[in-house]
Amino acid sequence: MTLLTRGQIEEALRRLGELAHAQDQVIELLAVGGAVMVLAYDARLATHDVDAVLLQPKLAQFLRRLVSQVADELGWPADWLNDGAKGFLMGASDGGVIFAAPGIVVNSPAPAQLLAMKLSAWRDDVDIRDAERLLRDWVGETGGDHEAIWSEIEPFIVPGQALKARYAFLDLWESVYGND
């Protein structure tokens, strides 16, 4: 499997919900990363996987079984939905529902938290493009006070990543809005 499109992600999430609903459960996820960029921002056509954190830890084993079943049904890797990005997650802000179907609700973090995660990761051109899109959508085309914006992002930076994220933010701000 290479990349998951919006349609494929929605199909898989819908199926997860069907399976949960059949057992009188509702799965609540906080999606991050590429899946949010695909589902909420239409910023990309596809992503490698769905990074999400289960908001009901008691259902973790249940969710793993369902994810495995959906993977088998679709011929996907077992880790198509995983919590690998949780190391970049500092708390859980509310950016709203980005997908819902019977048995499943998928939320996104607020833009400041998504941007904090992208700045902390800052691995490749994909992260940089995503961060630029998030910044432009959140702040607008004219910018503003970059220190005020940073103060909204900073609480979501994982300890040990602050310097990297700050430099990434300043670099991003300059490339989008200039030196002001």
Residue ranges and their predicted role:
Residues 1-180:
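Compositionally biased terminal segments of proteins
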